[in-house]
Design a protein with these regions (language model features):
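Short beta-strand segments enriched in hydrophobic/aromatic residues
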Residues: 10, 53-55
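Short amphipathic alpha-helical segments
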Residues: 10-37
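An amphipathic, aromatic/His-enriched active-site/gating alpha helix that lines ligand/cofactor pockets
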Residues: 28-37, 55-93
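Hydrophobic residues embedded in beta-strands of well-ordered beta-sheets
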Residues: 48-49
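Short, low-order "capping/linker" segments at domain edges
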Residues: 85-109
Length: 109
């Protein structure tokens, strides 16, 4: 399984609404279209971490391809009051919010 981690800023007290928006979004076929197998949302000191797991190592590409879908655009718009780019001056697309993995370990079974 491969993962992407989106990092952004989140308004304090908005985690329940953000979770609701994703619960509704994940109830559609969009996660399947994007290749998302699991989504986890985290917050820490007004930072937002969005971990998505994919079967293949092309999650960032699939997210980029999905951004023209009206449902993707809708959730992006719905999240704007709660989530903002970590660095608005450099953000151009969802790919600009992806953290860079610099270490990976997986136990063998």
């Amino acid at each position: 399984m491969h993962s992407t981690l989106i990092v952004a800023r989140m308004n304090p007290g908005s985690s329940e609404e953000v979770a609701r928006l994703f619960r509704d979004f994940d109830g559609t076929e969009m996660p399947h279209r994007m290749g998302t197998r699991r989504r986890q949302l985290f917050s820490y000191r007004n930072l937002y971490f969005h971990l998505q797991d994919f079967d293949a190592d092309n999650g960032g590409e699939l997210i980029e391809a999905a951004k023209t879908d009206p449902r993707f655009q809708r959730i992006s718009d719905d999240l704007k009051p709660f989530i903002e780019a970590y660095d608005p001056a450099t953000w151009r697309s969802p790919a600009d919010a992806l953290a860079t993995r610099f270490y990976d370990w997986e136990g063998r079974r």
